[in-house]
């Protein structure tokens, strides 16, 4: 009987031990199995929450339009401080959209209409153009050296000159100008310019004479002088409108400048206001902003040639205004010490 009881107790204990092992094993197995399931659920949840990546195509940057033509406009005797005072809103807008200098550009040592324009269009100093005079001496011929009209015409570009003074005929030979017209006020000059724009051109020079004429008669910076500049600004508006209407504006480089300034009733070169000139450039490839580097009137010719891919001449004193195109300065005027053509 005692032996049976011991066996029964042993059997109960053994059974409980087996149950314990089964339960413990089940618990361990459950935790092992469930752990990766939890991880998998979290991983799946994370992937589902991530938005699908959208590939955005990179925009293609188009190059700026090619410069197909250059228009140079010269206001005879325009001072830099008269532009805002006149006022000249169309020129100011052109300036704001382009590169400009109102403080660092100068003309030659003899700040007069004919010799100054000769240097402007030839890239040469007065002693090299041979234009020492400011009157129309037909028998003396034309400005010497290779000028931008020589280069443009040789390249097959249609060349146009519309001026307000007869003596400017001596700036370029007749065989290099397809069109040469003289008119004596800004409205008439702009009318011819609009007609020539409609015909097409490669290089055009427009000269407005009235500021100089009125300055000599009534004085620089007076009411009549400023009125002539306002009239000239209205003429500029008509020219710009013609370029827009014909779809030429985006491929036209425009340079606006002057041959000299003036004070009182003259511009004999005794004060800086006689020498200082505005220099404004607007159009394709131009980086807007103020230019503070020294600029000479001869640089107008060099910049024009550079823009039209015409060969720069070794004997030119003029240098392209590279900064206006956002390009590094390849050459500088010795003029940080002394201006060329002022010797």
Task: Give the positions of each predicted feature.
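Metal-dependent active-site segment of extracytoplasmic phospho-/sulfohydrolases and closely related
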Residues: 71-72, 90, 228-271, 304
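Catalytic metal-binding/acid-base residues of hydrolase active sites
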Residues: 78-79, 209, 242, 260-261, ...
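Active-site-proximal alpha/beta segments of enzymes that process anionic O-linked groups
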Residues: 66-69, 77-199, 306, 320-324
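Ser/Thr-rich, Proline-interspersed low-complexity disordered segments
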Residues: 25, 30, 35-65, 339, ...
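Active-site His/acidic residue clusters
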Residues: 166-177, 194, 198-234, 238
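Substrate-binding rim/cap in mid-to-C-terminal beta-strand-loop elements of soluble/periplasmic
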Residues: 121, 270-311, 322
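N-terminal Sec-pathway targeting helices
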Residues: 2-20
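Polar, surface-exposed loop/tail segments
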Residues: 310-342
